[in-house]
Regions:
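LysM (lysin motif) carbohydrate-binding repeats in extracellular/periplasmic proteins that recognize
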Residues: 1-20, 100-102
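Short histidine-centered loop motifs in beta-beta connectors
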Residues: 7-9, 78, 94, 111-135, ...
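Short, glycine-/polar-rich solvent-exposed loops and beta-turns at beta-strand/coil boundaries
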Residues: 9-17, 67-68, 145-148
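Surface-exposed, glycine-biased beta-strand/turn segments
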Residues: 17-103, 134, 163
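Residue-level recognition of beta-strand microenvironments
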Residues: 64, 94-95, 124, 141-144
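Zn2+-dependent peptidoglycan hydrolase active-site motif and core
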Residues: 86-125, 150-155
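Short glycine/proline-centered loop/turn elements that form peptide/ligand docking sites
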Residues: 101, 125-128, 137, 143-148
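Short, exposed beta-strand-loop hairpins at the edges of beta-sheets
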Residues: 143-146, 154-158
Length: 170
């Protein structure tokens, strides 16, 4: 683990700090995090834009779309924070590998060539084939896949071309 380059420890176990995320080569076990209880009448859904798009989570934009991050954006929030459908559509994928890349993730087809991806989930709140509305909870923020901290990685594609989500979100 100390020698595993992705951990950035330079071979020195003294570089491990409390709260550090440590990758275990070949590790497979993921401990699911229970979602927080839903409060009756909760109104924590992010506001929608005039075109119907809404933020995938309430949190801090930590990685905007651009040359260093050309596929999407990252919104940081605590593990267990709800992840919302950014627009209405049909869930086309629920799954993923907890150790690699996107980790647990969901893909939604919004029609007219639009598709969104939500990555690094701890748990899912939808099944493949389900229809969702903008603002519906589809999962919860986690630490699955390649991640440096709890966040949702959000991609928006139109006809297979990556779009800057900030051009669509309120």
């Amino acid at each position: 683990i100390v020698e595993f380059r992705a951990n950035g420890l330079a071979g020195d176990p003294n570089n491990i700090q409390p709260g550090s995320l440590i990758l275990v080569p070949g590790g497979k076990k993921v401990v699911p995090v229970a979602p927080p209880p839903v409060r009756p009448g909760a109104t924590d859904i992010p506001p929608a834009s005039e075109s119907g798009w809404t933020w995938p989570a309430l949190g801090l934009l930590t990685s905007p779309f651009g040359p260093a991050h050309p596929l999407g954006i990252d919104v940081a929030a605590p593990v267990g924070t709800p992840i919302y459908a950014a627009n209405s559509g049909q869930v086309t994928f629920v799954g993923g590998n907890p150790c690699c890349s996107y980790g647990y993730h969901v893909i939604i087809d919004h029609g007219n060539g639009y598709e969104t991806l939500y990555a690094h989930m701890s748990t899912f709140a939808v099944e493949s084939g389900a229809w969702v509305n903008a603002g519906d909870v589809i999962g919860y923020i986690g630490l699955t896949g390649r991640t440096t901290g709890p966040h949702v990685h959000f991609e928006l594609r139109r006809n297979g071309v990556y779009q800057d989500p900030l051009n669509y979100l309120p």
